[in-house]
A protein has these predicted regions:
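Terminal catalytic/cofactor-binding subdomain
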Residues: 5-156, 163-167, 196-220
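Extended, regular secondary-structure scaffolds
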Residues: 173-236
Length: 236
């Protein structure tokens, strides 16, 4: 964490500590002694996107399976950009094994209602035949449903459907309640609990934006993509 919560007031006899030294001091305080439990039990959640494809690898043109519930109102099985782009959403859970098991159960349930279709396992789509081969998600005739569809039509005009069909995994995390008093004590904060927590989360986001590129560089590369994907993006 950095930002205002990471600052150490200088004194006439002691210079301001560097960010690295303060980071090491804070990390040591969180991982040793009575504070070691403070990082355990945070809430975790996963949102996983996967394209429905036919046995030949082409993106499915069929509607979102009715047996999976309404994509507009189902909180755990919905669609993202495309009607074929299923999104599986876990609730926030404390244990990693619970998270993986819930996601596994969702996959098994979905596969029971896909017929001969498959969930494409990689982020980059395959066997793409231009923008027209990617159906935009539909959410019914209600005002909210129509708004969600029109929003996606706008994305198609701005970025193209092929780019929007790239799927991914979102990982959500929140620190456990016991973490915040410990961190506030280490930071010698005089702010209210609410203000301190908000400040700390924004500081974390700033650090993520500063260092997040290395995660994409190391783990976000796709070493191989289908030739149809690149040609569709240049002509779609």
């Amino acid at each position: 964490l950095s930002g205002r919560v990471a600052e150490v007031p200088p004194s006439p006899t002691q210079p301001r500590m560097t960010i690295d030294r303060e980071y090491e001091k804070r990390l040591s305080g969180l991982t040793n002694g009575r504070a070691a439990h403070a990082l355990q039990g945070g809430l975790k959640g996963i949102e996983k996107e996967s394209l429905r494809v036919r046995p030949n690898g082409q993106i499915s043109k069929t509607p979102h399976p009715a047996a999976l519930g309404s994509a507009l109102t189902n909180e755990i099985i919905t669609t993202d950009y495309s009607e074929a782009l299923i999104e599986l959403v876990t609730p926030p859970l404390h244990q990693s094994w619970e998270l993986v098991q819930f996601l596994c159960d969702l996959h098994q349930f979905v596969y029971r209602h896909l017929g001969d279709e498959l969930l494409w396992a990689t982020s980059m789509p395959c066997a793409v035949k231009g923008d027209a081969s990617i159906p935009i998600a539909r959410y019914g005739t209600s005002n909210v449903g129509r708004m969600k569809h029109v929003y996606r039509v706008g994305l198609a005009h701005r970025y193209g459907r092929v780019m929007q069909a790239i799927s991914g995994v979102h990982f959500n995390y929140s620190f456990p309640e016991d973490f915040w008093p410990v961190l506030a004590d280490l930071c010698q904060s005089r702010d209210s609990a609410h203000a301190f927590r908000s400040d700390a989360y924004f500081a974390l986001l700033r650090n993520y934006r500063r260092h997040g590129w290395i995660v994409l560089y190391l783990f976000g590369n796709s070493p191989a993509i289908c030739e149809s994907e690149s040609s569709a993006r240049s002509t779609g």
